[in-house]
Structures are given as structure tokens and as C-alpha cells.
Amino acid sequence: MERTLTILKPDCVRKQLIGAVTNMIERAGFRIVAMKKTRLTKETAGAFYAVHKERPFYGELVEFMSSGPCVPMILEKENAVADFRTLIGATDPAQADEGTIRKLYADSKGENIIHGSDSAENAAIESAFFFAAEEVVRVD
């Protein structure tokens, strides 16, 4: 069983889409094994997205991710990383396939509702950023 990390971003929370998006995730066969609502500071958002520090969108991303509450989750499923990337769709909702989370709910490339880990290795690193081992609970 593979795990991935997602974050329902501040725009998702503001639009009151937590339930709708979580429902899509569960209906796609993912198990939620950890979940919390939190608010990132500029410092914690900067640390989480440090890999993008030299990219032109970094400052805007940090501002956005610290603008309100978000909901990180660890998801579990066979082929979780790739399947989840398919479910959420392209970063730019205009390029996302019909029926994907971003096509349905995102407004722009910058405010695109949801984060999904891009590899199993990054999923493990990102999951540890938000969750201690004892917070991850698998229910069979």
C-alpha cells in the first residue's frame, strides 16, 4: 500500500469545499489515514515549499498558503501518488481534465484548491512535516 500527502489549500477551505473534495477522494478509493485542520505561518509555508525558493512564484505561494486554514491529509491506496495526481488534475485548472478536482473547483493556477505529492519519496517527507507517526491511524 502506498501513501501520499494532500493539502486542501486555503481557497478550498474558504469556499467550504472540504466535504465535497474529501468525498471525491474517498470515492476514488483512497483511505484517509491522517487529517487535521491547521494554519501555516509564512515561516512554515516557506519551509514546506523551500524546494521552490528560487522559482518566481515562491513568494506568492507562501503568501497564499499562509492566508487561511488548510487541511493536510495522508492518503493510502495502491499506486496512491500517481492515482492522486490524476484525480486532482493539472496545476492549471484550464489544462485539467474534465471531472478532476481542479477542473471542478479551482479558479486559477495560483489558487488551485489542492496539493498532491509528486513522488513517494516526497510524500514521506511532506507527511512527516505535518504528522507525527502516532497521528497516522489505519482502520481496516
From Swiss-Prot:
Cited PROSITE patterns: NDPK_LIKE
Keyword Kinase appears in the UniProt entry: yes
Cofactor annotation: Mg(2+)
GO biological process: CTP biosynthetic process; GTP biosynthetic process; UTP biosynthetic process
Keywords attached to this entry: ATP-binding, Cytoplasm, Kinase, Magnesium, Metal-binding, Nucleotide metabolism, Nucleotide-binding, Phosphoprotein, Transferase
Catalytic residues of the enzyme: 115
Entry-linked CDD domains: NDPk_I
Catalytic reaction(s) noted: a 2'-deoxyribonucleoside 5'-diphosphate + ATP = a 2'-deoxyribonucleoside 5'-triphosphate + ADP; a ribonucleoside 5'-diphosphate + ATP = a ribonucleoside 5'-triphosphate + ADP
A Pfam family the protein falls into: NDK
An MF annotation (GO) of this entry: metal ion binding
Example of a GO cellular component annotation carried by this entry: cytoplasm
Enzyme class (EC, first level): transferase
EC number in record: 2.7.4.6
SUPFAM superfamilies per the UniProt record, alphabetical: Nucleoside diphosphate kinase, NDK
Subcellular compartments: Cytoplasm
Keyword Transferase in annotation: yes
Protein purpose: Major role in the synthesis of nucleoside triphosphates other than ATP. The ATP gamma phosphate is transferred to the NDP beta phosphate via a ping-pong mechanism, using a phosphorylated active-site intermediate.
Assembly mode: Homotetramer.
NCBIfam families linked to this entry: PRK00668.1, PRK14541.1
Annotated HAMAP family: NDP_kinase
Family note: Belongs to the NDK family.
PANTHER family named among the record's database cross-references: NUCLEOSIDE DIPHOSPHATE KINASE (PTHR46161), NUCLEOSIDE DIPHOSPHATE KINASE DDB_G0292928-RELATED (PTHR46161:SF3)
Identification of the protein by name: Nucleoside diphosphate kinase
